[in-house]
Amino acid sequence: MVNLGTAVRSLLVHLIGLLVWQFDISISPVAAIVTDTFNSSDGGRLFQFPDGVQNWPALSIVVIIIMTIGGNILVIMAVSMEKKLHNATNYFLMSLAIADMLVGLLVMPLSLLAILYDYVWPLPRYLCPVWISLDVLFSTASIMHLCAISLDRYVAIRNPIEHSRFNSRTKAIMKIAIVWAISIGVSVPIPVIGLRDESKVFVNNTTCVLNDPNFVLIGSFVAFFIPLTIMVITYFLTIYVLRRQTLMLLRGHTEEELRNISLNFLKCCCKKGDEEENAPNPNPDQKPRRKKKEKRPRGTMQAINNEKKASKVLGIVFFVFLIMWCPFFITNILSVLCGKACNQKLMEKLLNVFVWIGYVCSGINPLVYTLFNKIYRRAFSKYLRCDYKPDKKPPVRQIPRVAATALSGRELNVNIYRHTNERVVRKANDTEPGIEMQVENLELPVNPSNVVSERISSV
């Protein structure tokens, strides 16, 4: 525990030192406190940043990179290996995890390298526009995935029958391909522009950063603000529809009036509702109000609650993304609009900090899934123990299934023997001919509700 506390304290000191060095605030009282923290016991300084020396405290960011890569690999494994996560929404989340993992593999290390060399690009110059293009590609892919998830869930809840005709694994892959195609279309012009004119991707001929005001404005709106607006609107519409469906159920509406509910639970509830409606009433004196309540499908409310829980998890993901990336894009727009009226050095330093806050968002999503979803949490725990075997199937029990070889008479009153291979012959009534019934074995799970739960969103 002492070692852990020391490590955390050392990491915080490293990060504070990086911010102090980045913003050059050594004169302020806060910086004085930090300076004392960085002083060693013998009066020497723990970290110094003279000209030409790398910013070694920035290496603490390696922890963020490792967490980003490892967490998103766990998400990809969970969606690939857990059958309960095989639905359209989780396919989108797996594709989002791929984009976030590539941020940790290809974008964040080079950004860390730039920090170590005081934002002087140390690699071949032709790699600068390629790196910027990858940064824009994966950032755009993240917001586009969240926008597509929001749209897909709203359509599924608002028009379930129409959505079911186009909801399959192949269709989900096609939608994901469209998301990536849009992201590639936004990022491809950057290397073309940068290779033709290096001034578009270099500031002061040393710092690798996108330096085309027109592209910054257009790209920010196309890749962030427009998808963000669509995402927020559709998310609140989804919450509105779910609340309306809940109120309809609480007021006693039948399932015929709930045609807008999600198809995930529409299939499993309609059959049950029909059986209850056609079944004879054992108590003729039962009040109509009570009969109407029994007619209501029992699983519908639970399914709506599951949809609400899934929407809450996605809402947290949306909110985290909004909080993490809005400062960068707003500052990016302001730096272009205000031009020389703004303090450009301050803007550059703010952008350098805000872009890393956005990068951290790529590593937070797996934590959100772990905290709010039992399936992801159980899967992550298994994989961290190097247990990659699928879960065992639930135990089964045998129940008799009646297969009629001949039917006659209006009503059937057949007593089924427990033994499986017996032939049971009973008469429907005294005036009707005999009816031969055959009893067969049928295996079902002990808990049939598991079959229903697999059709419900597992986000």
Swiss-Prot record:
The chain crosses the membrane at residues 57-81, 88-112, 130-152, 169-190, 215-237, 313-337, 349-371. Disulfide bonds join C128-C208, C338-C342. It holds the Pfam family 7tm_1. Ergotamine binds at T140, L210. GO terms for biological process: behavioral fear response; cGMP-mediated signaling; feeding behavior; intracellular calcium ion homeostasis; locomotory behavior; phospholipase C-activating G protein-coupled receptor signaling pathway; phospholipase C-activating serotonin receptor signaling pathway; positive regulation of calcium-mediated signaling. A motif (DRY motif) lies at residues 152-154. Residues 288-298 have a biased composition (Basic residues). Residues 82-87, 153-168, 238-312, 372-459 are cytoplasmic. Glycans are attached at N204, N205. The keyword Signal applies. Residues 274-302 are annotated as: Disordered. Disruption phenotype: No obvious phenotype at birth, but mutant mice are prone to sudden death from seizures. When fed ad libitum, adult mice display higher body weight and increased adiposity compared to wild-type littermates. No difference in body weight is found when they receive the same amount of food as their wild-type littermates, indicating that the increased body weight is due to altered feeding behavior. Overweight older mice develop insulin resistance and impaired glucose tolerance. Young mice exhibit insulin resistance, but normal glucose tolerance, due to increased insulin levels in the blood. Residues 33-56, 113-129, 191-214, 338-348 are extracellular. Belongs to the G-protein coupled receptor 1 family. This is 5-hydroxytryptamine receptor 2C. It comes from Mus musculus (Mouse). The lineage of its organism: Eukaryota, Metazoa, Chordata, Craniata, Vertebrata.
